[in-house]
Amino acid sequence: VQWSSSERSVISGLWAKVNAAEVGPQALARLLVLYPWTQRYFGKFGDLSSNAALMGNANVAKHGKDLLLADLKAVKNMDNVKALYAKXXXXXXXELNVDPDNFTLLGDCLTIVLAMKFGADFTPVDQAVWQKFVAVVVSGLSKQYF
């Protein structure tokens, strides 16, 4: 994937304003609420029985933050995302049997959370660049499936 300097600037600018401890848990909880079948991967996380339980679950919050911190590594290594996610892709495919479409769903949930957080500052251009970044991350996480 080729990244223009303006695209790199948009991605790094967005991430400079992201609080992983806030946005990550919101995105993961949104995924688990909107797509309840994804909860099957998180059986050890405790109570996932309601929206309130999901939003207040400390394990969901920690994992959401960790996922966002992993994405931050991708921001810092935009030219090498597939190699960066090689180990996580192998674990997600071979050990956890995660449906790769769930990565896209999580990326969509993250996009929604960012749009809500940034409002008008999350311009259509920013969203287009962000969606490109999400597609690269999803591709990196999905490469073990194909």
From Swiss-Prot:
The residues the record assigns to binding heme b are 63
Q: Which CDD domains match?
A: Hb-beta-like (cd08925)
Gene Ontology molecular function: haptoglobin binding; heme binding; metal ion binding; organic acid binding; oxygen binding; oxygen carrier activity; peroxidase activity
Q: Which terms under GO biological process does the entry name? A: hydrogen peroxide catabolic process
Tagged with keyword rRNA processing: no
Entry's InterPro entries?
A: Globin, Globin-like_sf, Globin/Proto, Hemoglobin_b, Hemoglobin_oxygen_transport
Task: Indicate the segments forming the Globin domain, all copies.
Answer: 2-146
Q: Which domain of life is it from?
A: Eukaryota
Record has Metal-binding as a keyword = yes
Question: Could you tell me which PROSITE patterns the record lists for this protein?
Answer: GLOBIN (PS01033)
Tissue expression per record = Red blood cells.
Q: Which keywords accompany this UniProt record?
A: Heme, Iron, Metal-binding, Oxygen transport, Transport
Its Gene Ontology cellular component terms are: blood microparticle; haptoglobin-hemoglobin complex; hemoglobin complex
Q: Can you tell me which family this protein belongs to?
A: Belongs to the globin family.
Entry function? Involved in oxygen transport from the gills to various peripheral tissues.
Q: State the oligomer form and interacting partners.
A: Heterotetramer of two alpha and two beta chains.
Specify the protein name.
Hemoglobin cathodic subunit beta
